[in-house]
Amino acid sequence: MSVPDAAVVKAFLLDLQNRICAGLQALDGQARFAADSWTRAEGGGGTSRVLTQGAVFEQAGVNFSHVTGAAMPASATAHRPELAGRSFEAMGVSLVIHPNNPYIPTTHANVRFFIAQKEGADPVWWFGGGFDLTPYYPFEEDVREWHQTSKDICAPFGDEVYPKYKKWCDEYFFLPHRNETRGVGGLFFDDLNQEGFDQSFSFMQAVGNGFLTAYAPIVERRKDTEFGERERQFQLYRRGRYVEFNLVYDRGTLFGLQTGGRTESILMSMPPLVRWQYAYTPEAGSPEADLYDNYLKPRDWV
């Protein structure tokens, strides 16, 4: 098994953050990312980059963090109790994009690396990550293309990889209290180390590098679609699901808050505007009902 090299992973992640920000700025054509570097008293730090009030993106945040600690937090040891008492490094790039136009989906992506060490024992390490798509007014061709790109990213690593991580994504981004998925899914993986460091790192790189390949064509296709107040209000209502998921279920959010992470960076995923409405039900046969009827349950798209 190849030896884990945290420095090489960190260099890739910093470069990935730069490339994704450059790609999103090019798609927006107007706004620029502001960078905000921070340090963590217990060890580590990061750089948050946020674009606001753009021509295409209402808010886009792309965060790099590298935190270290003397002991793993509860959120990380819940499903791996053998990690209790180990020092750790956690690094990753995480992003959430909230577009202006309701016909452009919101999206989230994340790639990360954990390593936990204890004197006299082999290091325990793994990669995780993925990306997912949350449309408000979905187009089937967009969803199929998104999943085809996801499948293409996984293909060099084995035929079983896409179905496995697609299913995991559907299961992870699910709101039990709403009985609906957060969106149309994509890829989700965690605890990846079985194939050794080099192969596992290669897969994480492929997912990170593939994100804009999957998302940019959808933005280009939908960014000039006309919309009105009805569509905007529905977008704001559905953004509420994003808030509910991130604050109640998301493992990364919980990990960040439990490790004393930087709150502004952790909550960068929150939409800038959102609304709730009591007992909302879409009108039968409406475009809004199409989302509920055909997209908020797991489907095979390719």
From Swiss-Prot:
Keyword Amino-acid biosynthesis appears in the UniProt entry: no
Active site annotation, chain numbering: 108 (proton donor)
Annotated residues for binding of a divalent metal cation: 98, 108, 147, 177
Keywords: Cytoplasm, Heme biosynthesis, Metal-binding, Oxidoreductase, Porphyrin biosynthesis
The UniProt record lists the keyword Nucleotide-binding: no
Organism, scientific name: Shewanella baltica (strain OS223)
Protein's UniProt name: Oxygen-dependent coproporphyrinogen-III oxidase
Cofactor: a divalent metal cation
EC number(s) recorded for this UniProt protein: 1.3.3.3
The reaction(s) this protein catalyses: coproporphyrinogen III + O2 + 2 H(+) = protoporphyrinogen IX + 2 CO2 + 2 H2O
An MF annotation (GO) of this entry: coproporphyrinogen oxidase activity
Family to which this protein belongs: Belongs to the aerobic coproporphyrinogen-III oxidase family.
Gene: hemF
Localization: Cytoplasm
Record site feature (Important for dimerization), residues: 177
Biochemical pathway: Porphyrin-containing compound metabolism; protoporphyrin-IX biosynthesis; protoporphyrinogen-IX from coproporphyrinogen-III (O2 route): step 1/1
UniProt-listed HAMAP family: Coprogen_oxidas
Major place of residence: cytoplasm
Free-text function comment from the UniProt entry: Involved in the heme biosynthesis. Catalyzes the aerobic oxidative decarboxylation of propionate groups of rings A and B of coproporphyrinogen-III to yield the vinyl groups in protoporphyrinogen-IX.
Pfam families listed in its UniProt record: Coprogen_oxidas
GO annotation terms (biological process): protoporphyrinogen IX biosynthetic process
Residues where substrate binds: 94, 110-112, 260-262
Assembly behavior: Homodimer.
Residue span of region Important for dimerization: 242-277
PROSITE patterns, per database record: COPROGEN_OXIDASE
